[in-house]
Amino acid sequence: MTRYFCCGSYFPGYPIYGTNFHGTFRATPLNCVVPLGSPLNYGCGCNGYSSLGYSFGGSNINNLGGCYGGSFYRPWGSGSGFGYSTY
């Protein structure tokens, strides 16, 4: 399992998925690995996901809505988020 943390628009063409991990993570480039607190957050709040419940499994308390507005989306899929790849 490859740990990764994505911030900003590494693959901005993707919508904000709220689906299962396999479908989302397989669309995630494995080179998208940046440290917490990276300046590449683009205002999407890449700090403290783990403290907000954005651990593996996601959470429905993500009021950022994937940084594009809305609600009840998992933070990854749009380029920001924290999780573990199945690769």
UniProtKB/Swiss-Prot annotation:
<keyword id="KW-0416">Keratin</keyword>
<protein>
    <recommendedName>
        <fullName>Keratin-associated protein 7-1</fullName>
    </recommendedName>
</protein>
<dbReference type="Pfam" id="PF15034">
    <property type="entry name" value="KRTAP7"/>
</dbReference>
<feature type="region of interest" description="11 X 2 AA repeats of G-[YCGS]">
    <location>
        <begin position="43"/>
        <end position="84"/>
    </location>
</feature>
<dbReference type="GO" id="GO:0005882">
    <property type="term" value="C:intermediate filament"/>
</dbReference>
<keyword id="KW-0677">Repeat</keyword>
<comment type="subunit">
    <text>Interacts with hair keratins.</text>
</comment>
<dbReference type="InterPro" id="IPR020184">
    <property type="entry name" value="KRTAP7"/>
</dbReference>
<comment type="similarity">
    <text>Belongs to the KRTAP type 7 family.</text>
</comment>
<comment type="function">
    <text>In the hair cortex, hair keratin intermediate filaments are embedded in an interfilamentous matrix, consisting of hair keratin-associated proteins (KRTAP), which are essential for the formation of a rigid and resistant hair shaft through their extensive disulfide bond cross-linking with abundant cysteine residues of hair keratins. The matrix proteins include the high-sulfur and high-glycine-tyrosine keratins.</text>
</comment>
